Structures are given as C-alpha cells and as structure tokens.
Amino acid sequence: MFESFYKNKRVLVTGATGFKGSWLVLWLKKLGADVRGYALKPNTVPSMFDALRISEKVPTVFGNILDRDLLEKTFNEFKPEIVFHLAAQPLVRLSYAEPVLTYETNVIGSLNVLEAARRCGSVKAFVNVTTDKCYENKEVAKG
C-alpha cells in the first residue's frame, strides 16, 4: 500500500539529518520515492545520518530553515509533491538557555517551510511532525 503510493513521488524531508529524519528518508527511498533532504549538517558524532551513509543515497541540501532564499530555491528546483517537516530545535534544556533561537527555529522556521511549500505550487501534501512537548503534562494517578 505505502509502496504504490510513494513510488516515484517527489518527497522533501526537512530535518533529514536528525534521528527521525534519517530513518524517514531511508524508508521513503526504499518505498521508491524520489527523496530530497533539507537540514543542518549533523551535530553529533557519530550521527545516524553519517552512520547510515545517507548522503550517498539521498541528495541533501545543508541549510537552515531560517534561510528563506535557500528554502525557496530548494522547493522551486525540486518541486516536491509531498513535504515532511521535521526540522526543529528539539532540546528542552537548550530552549531554556536559548529561547529566542528556539522560537525563531520552531515558529518562524516552520512558517518559512510552509510559505516555500505554498509558493512553489507543486506540494499536494504537507506533514508537520511535532513533539509531545507541545502538550500540557497531566499527571495521572496510578493505582
């Protein structure tokens, strides 16, 4: 079912160098999608992206989602039909230390990705991947 849907579809994955993004681009590639990544360079050693040698399998643009010009160029050149948006500043502790960076990346950066998708005209589906941290923690009594 998935294979027939994704086969030959142009799919762009933001956050492709992250843990989830790395696995997603490989899975989409295995399903026959024409996949492109857009992400910062991996910031851990080793990284899943490097360990799986994804740069040899999936063309990836190394850039920041705050860079509107590079985002628009990437969208306009590749013309994705489907976008999986995983790029974010996900670290809670860093968000306390760097709240402006976190807000810019997670809010303005996401807006930039959405706007690039809207303007390029080829996107038919946009999947915004988020985190459990966006929900209020409710303590449940265990019994």
Where do the language-model regions lie?
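N-terminal Rossmann-like NAD(P)+-binding domain of SDR-like oxidoreductases, especially those catalyzing
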Residues: 1-143
